[in-house]
Amino acid sequence: MWRNYIDAIDTSSDTSHFWVNGSKDMHISLHKDGLLNTYNIRKLSDDIYEINTIAYYPESAIPGCLVNAIYKVCAMHTAQGWQLMNYFDAIKGLYKQHTLGRIDFYFGNGVVVDKKRMKESANFVELFLDKYNLDYNNRITYLTAGSIDECSAMVGLSYTPMRTHKKYAGRAMGNIILSTRLNHIHEVVHAIMLPLFPSAPLFLHEGIASYYGGMAEQPYKSVKSIARAYVEKEKVDFSNKESLAVSLGNDIQLFNVVGAAIIEYALQQGGESEVIRLFSAANYDQVFELLGVDNSQRANFIRGLFN
């Protein structure tokens, strides 16, 4: 079991055969950098063991930021021998579960089952896939609890630097959604688009999620108005994506809003097919190349999106 675990976390080669059903644990891929220290192995049953690991950096590499994650995966004895499986797959039977459309909802302790909001998310998935003509064969696993930290614990993430107690927070990892809300459309969009377009620029992913799902419990139109006031007042250099690393207050990021404004522009110019074309870009600069905007005109183009 231990030998297979060491081989399975090697990110330099295809390790899917070490995993039950070839499904690699999300948290390994998210926290593959740095060093791994397995500090405990606990028996859950005769066939399943829980493996507890800390992902960390040497202090010389990132001073003051040592622990990247504390997480759990499981090892299961199968006909092929010991294989790894997602922690949630091992313990999901402990949680109340409902299925609507393509979404499997799981509820932490004390969470009210609100079928109206669940239906909003399930219906949005079908409408979005139809609108964009996307070939999406995944099911979405939607975990909800009283806080994001509780949701994270359900999938085996005991700690990440992204811990938060904000009620509107959410997170999508592949086709897994963690949220305190059952109709968190921003994260639903991520759960669809991130697996389909893993190489697309992050600001497009945040843009399309913010365009349809808003951010910080505010719709896109509201945050666009806030960004408009900032863009009109401040002299922002839009020549590179680092210039977008600006907080507009109340957890509204200029990075997300500019991405959403570009999605809006693409829809106006060529509809959903134009949006999908932009997702073929590999970086920030290529997005503007596809839009036909050279670097000297980039700042004026982006400001024009807010007129």
PLM feature spans:
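A short hydrophobic beta-strand element
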Residues: L44-Y57
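Extracytoplasmic
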Residues: D46-I48, N68-I70, L100, N137
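Short beta-strand edge/turn micro-motifs at domain boundaries
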Residues: A61-Y95
